[in-house]
Amino acid sequence: MFRTMMRAKLHRATVTEANLNYVGSITIDEDLMDAVNIVENEKVQIVNNNNGARLETYVIKGERGSGVVCLNGAAARLVQPGDKVIIICYGLVTEEEIHTQEPKIAVLDDNNQIIEMLGAEKAGTIL
């Protein structure tokens, strides 16, 4: 049996742009993608901390070092520049892998720069 587990997360990313007229997806700074091992065209879930909206889309590489987090197409209706979002990527793991698989979590500052890398989450608050 396979289980769907969180394998990567960009925590508290700041939306830099919302582009309604772009063909769907989310554009993410390639440095951020590399930090948590998210690849282009991979499916992600986005949770908007400001309004509670949740959506799924796929990733497009953004310019390295730019800090870009841009929601494109219809998803642009669910965010505003400046909103804080959590970008989550899941993977399928076997029962044997459950206890050895560790997610990569990047906690970001207001400029989408990594301030902390985590391997596992504990209950609590990260601001």
UniProtKB/Swiss-Prot annotation:
UniProt family annotation: Belongs to the PanD family.
UniProt-recorded name of the protein: Aspartate 1-decarboxylase
Subcellular location: Cytoplasm
Organism from which the protein derives: Bacillus cereus (strain ATCC 14579 / DSM 31 / CCUG 7414 / JCM 2152 / NBRC 15305 / NCIMB 9373 / NCTC 2599 / NRRL B-3711)
Ranges annotated as spanning the membrane: none
Main location: cytoplasm
GO biological process, alphabetically ordered: alanine biosynthetic process; pantothenate biosynthetic process
UniProt modification remark: Is synthesized initially as an inactive proenzyme, which is activated by self-cleavage at a specific serine bond to produce a beta-subunit with a hydroxyl group at its C-terminus and an alpha-subunit with a pyruvoyl group at its N-terminus.
Cofactor(s) of this protein: pyruvate
Main EC class the enzyme belongs to: lyase
Keyword Aminoacyl-tRNA synthetase: no
Classification lineage: Bacteria, Bacillati, Bacillota, Bacilli, Bacillales
Job of this protein: Catalyzes the pyruvoyl-dependent decarboxylation of aspartate to produce beta-alanine.
Quaternary organization: Heterooctamer of four alpha and four beta subunits.
GO terms under cellular component: cytosol
Top-level division of the source organism's lineage: Bacteria
Active site feature: 25, 58
NCBIfam families linked: panD
A matching Pfam family: Asp_decarbox
PANTHER family, sorted: ASPARTATE 1-DECARBOXYLASE (PTHR21012:SF0)
Protein residues bound to substrate: 57, 73-75
Reaction catalysed by this enzyme: L-aspartate + H(+) = beta-alanine + CO2
Keywords associated with the record: Autocatalytic cleavage, Cytoplasm, Decarboxylase, Lyase, Pantothenate biosynthesis, Pyruvate, Schiff base, Zymogen
Pathway: Cofactor biosynthesis; (R)-pantothenate biosynthesis; beta-alanine from L-aspartate: step 1/1
